[in-house]
């Protein structure tokens, strides 16, 4: 899903190598897993203290409850880093996008049970959620096969929602006039502010979630499908995703949805060209 859910109701809120020392498990204490780039540290941030540990990636907070596996939290951190520094040269590919994420105090929360999301988030922050059990660090390394890694989706949603939509409102803004929305209208077979009972037969993006609103959700979902298809993440998933998204390869996106393809490959925006695998600078 596109955003953090409280009791599964959609909302968007406007809302580093460490020692091998292991703390005793418990609230506010963390079992550390070694990573060459990122540290897991205890967390007590206001409004998010129920998530007892976190990793900071280029200033972006990634939180997790204690039941979330450390390796999966670190995987999410590495995917975040690879999306933002796709060539892994140590420099952010699009500083404006990161600046907007920082302005919006963007954050990711990782949960084990849905009840972990029954929290009151600081209103000035924009957040995203990711489940422990939907995180599969081996998906990309196994040739984009097996159970899909939701990290590729949820981390990208956060970057697009808190970053691109603010950095480039004319292109990626969550509004009816943005280039993203115009391309999406073609992909859906029309401009539907309410979910249609049946999408037109010529639509290639058909998202039926009634909680997913046109501007704040449908646009972000559409961007995710298009970019990850260009990057190769969906190439083996057509049978799984075809009812929602039909253009599961880069060639299909380029040849069928040239509007979004040109937008996402425009060098001005410097979108990723390599699918993250969770091994940033390893």
Predicted regions and their residues:
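N-terminal low-complexity, Pro/Thr/Ser-rich intrinsically disordered segments
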Residues: 23-58
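Acidic/His-rich structured neighborhood in mature extracellular/periplasmic domains
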Residues: 57-197
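Conserved aromatic-histidine-acidic binding/catalytic patches
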Residues: 64-71, 143-147, 208-220, 244-252
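Sec-dependent signal peptide recognition
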Residues: 5-14
